């Protein structure tokens, strides 16, 4: 998008898109950061649980390779520790299966970070319960010291039985009950803000921006994010990069030569979860500005409206 919007115009747009009531989707989804073996390997415990959790309409699953890679690629002045703390503030629960070299590293790092440790649930193969190992004497012991429900043990058969079951059948199983009790405890003791300042929810601001500002470029999105999310410039760019990557993977937006555009799927989603009347009035006012080169949006023409 080559059009130039003044700071005042950007602030007016931000005011509308962040106004209480503009977003009308569900706020109750549980966000789970799922770590473990290769999710593409159908035998990995992480893959099995991801398939089971996908049966729940109130659960969003995020993977370190999707989120952390985007964060680390642009971390610049931000240390890994600060990015881990951002993650700790963003997700409800971290579930980790120590089943691969990468997940061993994550377990060690997360268990030693106080903010992450409070949200971590480690699910360990029961056959390693009594094994004399660094994992048992280090991270696992540390987790159990702070929260006895943070380490669950089960057999591969127990996990498979739960993951292959319907939700109604799974509710009767011991592993399901233990897992839900652990998740409930973590969420009760660690409240998460789910506004656009949360990296996992920043798309609630950026997606309608892309919807309204046809072919908006990366630079403009970063400027808007910096002013709306109120993080520093580097972190704002990291958040935009992460959100844009996720939206492209979800096929809600496309990256064109001149900027980003919503797909039909993305447009349908935007109109289903945001206030349609406000969207339509904003779009009309933006078109008028582009045609007439008005100095500001006419804020009075776009009152907050209920559909």
Curated annotation (Swiss-Prot):
Keywords: Antiviral defense
GO BP, sorted A to Z: defense response to virus
InterPro entries found in the cross-reference section: STM3845-like (IPR049725)
Superkingdom per UniProt: Bacteria
Signal peptide as annotated in the record: none
Physiological role: Possible ribosyltransferase/DNA-binding component of antiviral defense system retron Ec86, composed of a non-coding RNA (ncRNA), a ribosyltransferase/DNA-binding protein and a reverse transcriptase (RT). Expression of the 3-gene retron confers protection against bacteriophages T5. At multiplicity of infection (MOI) of 0.02 cultures grow normally when infected with T5 without collapsing, at MOI 2 cultures enter growth stasis.
Descriptive protein name: Retron Ec86 putative ribosyltransferase/DNA-binding protein
Organism, scientific name: Escherichia coli
């Amino acid at each position: 998008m080559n059009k130039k919007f003044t700071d005042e115009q950007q602030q007016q747009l931000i005011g509308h898109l962040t106004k209480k009531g503009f977003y009308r989707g569900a706020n109750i989804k549980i966000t789970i950061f799922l770590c473990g073996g290769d999710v593409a390997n159908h035998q990995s415990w992480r893959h099995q649980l991801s398939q089971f959790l996908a049966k729940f309409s109130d659960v969003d699953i995020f993977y370190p390779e999707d989120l952390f890679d985007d964060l680390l690629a642009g971390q610049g002045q931000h240390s890994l520790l600060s990015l881990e703390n951002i993650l700790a503030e963003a997700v409800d629960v971290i579930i980790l299966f120590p089943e691969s070299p990468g997940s061993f590293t994550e377990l060690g790092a997360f268990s030693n970070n106080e903010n992450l440790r409070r949200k971590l649930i480690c699910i360990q193969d029961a056959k390693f319960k009594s094994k004399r190992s660094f994992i048992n004497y280090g991270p696992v012991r540390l987790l159990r010291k702070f929260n006895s429900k943070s380490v669950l043990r089960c057999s591969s058969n127990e996990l498979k039985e739960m993951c292959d079951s319907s939700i109604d059948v799974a509710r009767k199983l011991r592993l399901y009950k233990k897992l839900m009790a652990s998740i409930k405890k973590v969420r009760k003791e660690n409240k998460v803000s789910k506004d656009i300042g949360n990296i996992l929810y920043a798309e609630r601001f950026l997606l309608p921006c892309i919807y309204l500002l046809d072919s908006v470029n990366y630079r403009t999105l970063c400027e808007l994010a910096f002013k709306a999310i109120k993080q520093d410039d580097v972190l704002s760019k990291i958040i935009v990069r992460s959100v844009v990557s996720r939206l492209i993977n979800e096929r809600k937006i496309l990256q064109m030569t001149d900027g980003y555009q919503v797909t039909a799927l993305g447009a349908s989603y935007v109109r289903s979860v945001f206030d349609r009347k406000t969207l339509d009035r904003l779009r009309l006012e933006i078109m008028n500005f582009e045609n007439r080169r008005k100095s500001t949006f006419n804020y009075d023409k776009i009152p907050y409206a209920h559909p």
